[in-house]
Amino acid sequence: MSCEDDWLNTSDDEEKHGVFGGGSLELQKLERTHRNRGYRDGISSAKEENLQEGFDMKFPEGSRLGFQVGEVIGKLQTLDSLFGAQDSELRSDYKEALAQLQISRVLTHANFSEQMDATEALSSLLARWEGALVKYTSRYIPNV
């Protein structure tokens, strides 16, 4: 790309006289200010559009993930409320699940790729607690 192609480059004439040929320093300053603001507004607008597009693409996955975590915690909490007093393993697992499935721990950069896809580590974590849920459900509610 040559300097002539760069619309942000100003020629010496534009610097001296402004785009519209005005020689006033105040007018030149005003033109420069508006040109810079227009450039920044364009950059900001492009960033917002890309951010919104990324949000729109990944929101369903994040929503599903949040629902999945909430469902595991809720069901383990119910089992703990009903049977935790007599089952120390269940109570211990429930407390550990609460700690490991905190949203601030689940939604860390380490659990997602550059494309914001869930990593194997996150999938393994969820599979572990879903497995525990199946174990305790079949132990206490065998017909489910």
Swiss-Prot record:
Membrane-spanning ranges: none
Role summary: The complex LTO1:YAE1 may function as a target specific adapter that probably recruits apo-RPLI1 to the cytosolic iron-sulfur protein assembly (CIA) complex machinery. May be required for biogenesis of the large ribosomal subunit and initiation of translation.
Gene name in the database record: YAE1
Compartment(s) of residence: Cytoplasm; Nucleus
GO terms for MF: protein-macromolecule adaptor activity
UniProt keyword terms in alphabetical order: Cytoplasm, Nucleus
Protein name, UniProt field: Protein YAE1
Top-level taxon of the source organism: Eukaryota
Subunit structure: May form a complex with LTO1.
Source species: Eremothecium gossypii (strain ATCC 10895 / CBS 109.51 / FGSC 9923 / NRRL Y-1056) (Yeast)
Family: Belongs to the YAE1 family.
Record flagged with keyword S-adenosyl-L-methionine: no
InterPro entries found in the cross-reference section: Essential_protein_Yae1_N, Yae1-like
